Amino acid sequence: MNDIMGSTDGYEELPYIKYRKVVADMVELASMKHQMKGKMEVDVTLAREKLRLYKARTGETQSFTAWFVKCVAQAVSENKQIHGLRKGKKIIIFNDVDVLIMIEKMMGKDLVALPYVVRKADKKDIKEVQTEIRAAQKHDLNNPSIMIGSKSWLMDLYPHLPKQVRMLVCKVISRNPHHIKANTGTISVSSIGMIGKVNGWISPISPLPLSFAVCGITKKPGVVEDRIEIREQVALAFAVDHDLIDGAQVTRFLSRLTELMEDGFSLE
């Protein structure tokens, strides 16, 4: 042990990049929420087949993540209270559905996941959502920001502030739903399973009223018209702000989301 502690050959020192401060603050804010958390599986056999047929027909790949964002946005647009935000004695429910996603980028020598908000995702088709995500992935980080597409000086200054000041900024923003929506949207989606194979669930951590983690897609036996068939199932984990919405409303939302996904909603 002494040899390891006394020699640089026994360990490696890495810089604590500024973006990790933002993540730590968001986790701390999320820990203050009273969230309902759950796990589910959805049959995406038809959707995956449509994605494969589209590629065979056009030579272009449609993104599963973009499609999932579209499905979530559609389900939320039909159950808007699910993404409501509290302001004092009122709940503010926005007409537009803004979805925050995480996009991996190189920041210097470090690979980091940076947030990007797809605005009005409910009013865009899959191709528009995908094009926007692809553009964000190619976004130039020569002048790095902690949020892709953000032009806010506060967002760039934020990680350089002392912890007490950062948390004060967060509390001020969190009291105003319009500020929350402008900075982070109202829903977060993390596509963990699109990065690597994940046979299981990883729960999302977010202070937003609704968050999803898209985990792995696996083949499992399922029942279709009383027949056992091999089906493709995607594992989803979710968290909902219980202070703002009840279980029955969450169930209706998840039921609609399941219908959209099983039907391959909006896929050609």
Task: Show the residue positions of the predicted features.
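C-terminal catalytic/motor cores of large multi-domain enzyme assemblies
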Residues: 1-268
